[in-house]
Amino acid sequence: MSLQITDIRKAFGGFQALDGVTLSVGEGQLVGLIGPNGAGKSTLFSVVSGFIEADGGEVRFKGGDLGRQSPAARARKGLLRTFQVPREFSHLTVRDNLKAAAPGQTGEGLVGLFLRPGEVARQEAEITAKADEVIAFLRLGHVADLPSGRLSGGQKKLLELGRVLMVEPSLILLDEPFAGVNPVLIEELVERIRELNARGIGFLIIEHDLQALTRLVPILHVMDRGRILASGSPGEVLEDAKVREAYLGGAA
């Protein structure tokens, strides 16, 4: 099992954001996570990725307990996340945003001080080549030299995914990749996710766009009030009476 989340609990004051969440993502699996606003989905992502600490429970990745490991330490193991609101540097070009996300550039940024000039040049060339590879994969060549602040919402979501790809992930937590994205770029994102998954990269995806998500993932979990309400195939889950009441407003 690539990711195992067991009995995770987290409270903020008197509000129980996560109340014993247990779920898993197997090696190379595509798994979806839906639920109403305030269900605890993004809080769960923040716990799993190391941005906040749980009050109880356990997160294991590739068999090892992540404990209190930092987001950077988890990223080095191949566990990375995106954010619903992309966190690009708006004054940097797309290419330079990708280069800034490479190991040794952020989080470990003093590494260059201990390299000989020739080694620095070689590292820079390797990072640039990797950035160009990601740009080609994401079909962003036509905007590669534009400041990222000029990108559309969908292009920023592609760039957010690209920044994660600079770190060689084995499992990506995607936080609402289709939110605010036009249908054409949703299709582009879906195809890129499928292609990455075919290469063996696993995904746990939070999303409100049920149409896009349910044709992408074979396994779906529904959260409500900090708990897993239902799990199964998209067809099974969306026929569950509890899900229809909590998430679909009782719609038939």
Model regions: which residues?
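Catalytic Walker B motif of ABC-type/P-loop ATPase nucleotide-binding domains
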Residues: 172-176
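Helix-to-loop junction immediately C-terminal to a conserved catalytic motif
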Residues: 49
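Conserved ABC ATPase "signature" region
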Residues: 110-143, 191-194
